[in-house]
């Protein structure tokens, strides 16, 4: 939906739109990889706040800077923030007492958000789209404090090796 808006409202070419979208995804990938290295030593809450700050800042700047080169950089930064944010969420799934149930809830939330996004974004201006992205991060701010700041101890740390059952291969 946003790809069409970049073409229609900002007059980007199809090639430029693909590069901007790829820049966003590259940022997401790099942010997730960086989080995988930092999550053991940094606070999960701080990583989440960093991701939110990067995404809000980049999306806010996208409202004011609409040229291709700047948008390309800002979408990378927004993706980087999304990578931090998403990687902490996925790590939280693994640390949950019921990871399968938590993953199912995350998939449901993702499906609902995608549905709402596809219904709403085609009716928004370019600035409205960026404000929508900002709002999705802002509404999650009160919940960041619920994220454990550090990694919870794993069962393998608490259980002697000889008493652990082998994992099931499925």
Q: Model-derived features: where do they sit?
A:
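Paired small-residue
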Residues: 58, 69-78
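C-terminal membrane-cytosol helix-exit motif in multi-pass small-molecule transporters
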Residues: 118-122, 126, 134-156
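Short hydrophobic/small-residue motifs within alpha-helical transmembrane segments
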Residues: 24-26, 111-112
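Cytoplasmic helix-loop-helix junction between adjacent transmembrane helices
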Residues: 74-108
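Membrane-interface helix caps of multi-pass secondary transporters
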Residues: 2-11, 93
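Structural signature of the two symmetry-related core transmembrane helices
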Residues: 46-61
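Helix-to-loop junctions at the C-terminal end of transmembrane segments
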Residues: 31-44
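Helix-breaking motifs and short loop linkers at transmembrane-helix boundaries and internal kinks
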Residues: 11, 64-69
